[in-house]
Amino acid sequence: MNPVIKTFQFGQSTVTLETGRIARQATGAVLVTVDNDVTVLVTVVGAKQADPGKGFFPLSVHYQEKTYAAGKIPGGFFKREGRPSEKETLTSRLIDRPIRPLFPEGFMNEVQVVCTVVSTSKKTDPDIAAMIGTSAALAISGIPFEGPIGAARVAFHESTGYLLNPTYEQLAASSLDMVVAGTSDAVLMVESEAQELTEDQMLGAVLFAHDEFQAVIKAVKELAAEAAKPTWDWKPADKNSALFDAIRAEFGEAVSQGYTITVKADRYARLGELRDQAVAKFSGEEGQPSAGEVKDIFGEIEYRTVRENIVNGKPRIDGRDTKTVRPLNIEVGVLPKTHGSALFTRGETQALVVATLGTARDAQLLDTLEGEKKDPFMLHYNFPPFSVGECGRMGGAGRREIGHGRLARRSVQAMLPAADVFPYTIRVVSEITESNGSSSMASVCGASLALMDAGVPMKAPVAGIAMGLVKEGEKFAVLTDILGDEDHLGDMDFKVAGTAKGVTALQMDIKINGITEEIMEIALGQALEARLNILGQMNQIIGESRTELSANAPTMIAMKIDTDKIRDVIGKGGATIRAICEETKASIDIEDDGSIKIFGETKEAADAAKQRILGITAEAEIGKIYVGKVERIVDFGAFVNILPGKDGLVHISMLSDARVEKVTDVLKEGQEVEVLVLDVDNRGRIKLSIKDVAAAKASGV
């Protein structure tokens, strides 16, 4: 196959799509280049036959950043890329979310997407190029796929408005970082963080991105017209409508009644009984459908029952209307020895959230393509199997946990104080102890509460809410505070977090076409109403950050010294600062501008380290009285140490008003004496007096 190349303009960037030159044995492969800044190779491979043992669609997306792309060699002993970084995992999820709903229902063939960043100038994030490449590779592969999709990143400046596909530099000055993906007529995915933008500004960004990425969809279609392989001859299995009707006639009413049981465990137990009865009645004998087929149809009946009840105005599964938030129970300071803690319960979803303060050295070190960075804020989300009453694998964080943790982090990050105001490293951990929908938004509320409990000076409290949608034909219902079942059986997962003033994070995943601007407006409006309700209840428990840090938190003291004194504090080979840290049990961070941060496990430790540094950096003040120690006696006087590393001379004539024949008649080495600084010459030599101390004290020095 001869290479096919398509070039198009996408906002301020020129994008080139090339296929037919690299990775030709993959089902589909596209090399995407954006402005010669970023190059990503995207491959798609699809299995021709489905694995009959799998009852799900085995799609996997792998985004990987090669260090050679930025002209770097990996750190570490083995000098090769290891397990995926958090950034790679999050980008893999970002690509997966908009493409997954576009594979046809019933398609069970394994599909693997691999996006490899092979070149970057480190000016822009390669994730949009990877998403465009995924769309193009799927479009030319012949695999059944209802695309193509487009994707775009949007920034926002109050003065200039929306900006398409900003650079890292432009993004740093923006109050919005939003990624949007979708088809020519529908938005499928939104991921964003913002600095208290209004709902209208957020919706405007979504619509702006959708309009702009039509250029991507047009270019992908043109590439596919020239380079696409024949579409696979795949058809979904025929549905057994007779079996569906029979099971529904027998169990439909019981299923509907089962979905009125408000307690999740009881509801699941009852529906499990009904499912087992259906399997026993309609399968097992020769010539009857398999148990798997009966279970699938029973699941279809559950799906339709819940949806029809909701769009026809019946109460939801737990008896609520579409706008009511589940009952809240909020506690702070629940763990006595932690720095800050909160227990946030919303219905059957519960998060135990803990905030910990650390020193600058506790910051997360990130080795990225753009270089090494230090991240002073971490938010980790844990979802143990007991939270849903199950046994399961325990171990490191999975993709879902990483994704939920990042969403919660985005939600509260904009409200954290600046590093120069509050220079602590902050780690928040959300332990999901019960789950029935929207645990990530419970983590947002709990994180805000725990941070305020810890005394972190938050700009404003933050709350989050998950919205859902059920749409049948022209009928639709937007649901506030969705349950796990409503998330699973609905058409949209729409999470909004923010303050009373504006939105700080918006995440949206849509499973169907036809989500209109009107529906998104309604969802944002209901989310605002719910968010204000939750914030009101949170503020009754703790309305603002505590004025003092927890007694268990490290004490931090900030100070500044002259830059030419830095070497004195550090000492030869770091000996001085190391000695201070070891002796006071404090940790000390010194910046090139002379800024010093001292962290002590106790206030006494931090104060002791501060005094040591002041002693090293202090200058002798003329006219000030010091208590010094006689270091050395000579014929013409005595050298007295008044500050660490600083000795002054008391001339024999300055020892006493009476005549002194020998210095040793008045002083001895090691003796402590009060001395007055008379002068410091331009060479730093200090002239001291003992005889003038009394007069200086009398005059009020």
UniProtKB/Swiss-Prot annotation:
A Pfam family it matches: RNase_PH
UniProt subcellular location: Cytoplasm
Family the entry assigns: Belongs to the polyribonucleotide nucleotidyltransferase family.
S1 motif domain ranges (all copies): 623-691
Family annotation (PROSITE patterns): KH_TYPE_1, S1
EC number: 2.7.7.8
KH domain: residues covered: 554-613
Reported function: Involved in mRNA degradation. Catalyzes the phosphorolysis of single-stranded polyribonucleotides processively in the 3'- to 5'-direction.
InterPro entries assigned to the protein according to its UniProt record, in alphabetical order: ExoRNase_PH_dom1, ExoRNase_PH_dom2, ExoRNase_PH_dom2_sf, KH_dom, KH_dom_type_1, KH_dom_type_1_sf, NA-bd_OB-fold, PNPase
One Gene Ontology term from the biological process aspect of the record: RNA processing
Gene3D superfamilies referenced in this protein's UniProt entry, alphabetically: GHMP Kinase, N-terminal domain, K Homology domain, type 1, Nucleic acid-binding proteins
GO cellular component: cytosol
Keyword Transmembrane helix: no
Assembly and interaction partners: Component of the RNA degradosome, which is a multiprotein complex involved in RNA processing and mRNA degradation.
Binding sites annotated in the UniProt record for Mg(2+): D487, D493
Catalytic activity: RNA(n+1) + phosphate = RNA(n) + a ribonucleoside 5'-diphosphate
Superkingdom as given in the UniProt entry: Bacteria
Cofactor(s) named in the record: Mg(2+)
Protein name in UniProt: Polyribonucleotide nucleotidyltransferase
Keyword Iron-sulfur: no
Sorted UniProt keywords: Cytoplasm, Magnesium, Metal-binding, Nucleotidyltransferase, RNA-binding, Transferase
GO terms of molecular function: 3'-5'-RNA exonuclease activity; magnesium ion binding; polyribonucleotide nucleotidyltransferase activity; RNA binding
SUPFAM superfamilies (UniProt xref): Eukaryotic type KH-domain (KH-domain type I), Nucleic acid-binding proteins, Ribonuclease PH domain 2-like, Ribosomal protein S5 domain 2-like
